Structure formats: structure tokens, C-alpha cells
């Protein structure tokens, strides 16, 4: 596996592209603190998107869940964003490092390149 650093100046564009490519894909969201404690915020839920939390902030919002229940997790004061890739160069996980030493990972249940996906992600009825 390889990791690709995303330049801070292109976070908005990269996160927007990531969200459009992977909306509806099944992910798990975990946080690891600087002391090594691990918490799972969400497991095996559809990704809604990853974006700046607000226009005036560098904080990053991660939205996951069904259309009936959406969970949003915010990463405050991010200092680095990385994409972890499989050997086939498919996106495996998006990793966000925060100033306080916390690392938030959005990991795909089934990593694959977007062009390998057959069809359109399932959308729940409203």
C-alpha cells in the first residue's frame, strides 16, 4: 500500500472530487487519539461526503449514514490529509491528521477504483 499526501491548497477540490466519486460507498470511520485510544464513530455505513465544515474554517466534516439517520463527525484543526491506496492504486482510505494528534480514518469496506464499480450506488427512498 502507498499513501499520497494531499496538498493543503487543494483540500477543497480533492475532498469534493472524493465525495462525488465515492458517495454511497460503504465505509467505516475510526479515530485514534495521540495516546493510541481508538474509537469507532461509524461502521459499514454509506458515505455522504467529506467537505470543509464551513467556508471560514479549515475543519473537515465527514457525513455518513442512511437517508434517515446521518452522522456528521468533524475533524478540528486538521494539519494533513492523505489518501491510502491499494497495490492496484484504488482508494483504500482517507486519513485526516489533526493538530491535537488525533487521526481520523475513513476506510472503504471494498476498496476499488471508481471505474470498476458496476452501476450506480443504491439510494434509499425518502
Task: Please tell me what each predicted stretch does.
Residues 14-18, 32-35, 48:
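Short secondary-structure capping/turn segments at boundaries of alpha-helices and beta-strands
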Residues 1-23:
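N-terminal leader/targeting segments and the immediate start of mature chains
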Residues 74-126:
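Helix-rich interaction surfaces within compact, conserved domain-sized segments
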Residues 23-32:
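A short, Trp-centered hydrophobic/proline-enriched beta-strand micro-motif
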Residues 31-37, 64-66, 96-100:
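Short acidic, glycine-rich loop/turn motifs
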Residues 36-46:
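Short coil-to-beta-strand transition motifs
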Residues 19-20, 37-39, 52-53:
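Short secondary-structure boundary/capping segments within folded domains
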Residues 45-93:
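Acidic, aromatic-enriched beta-alpha/helix-loop junctions
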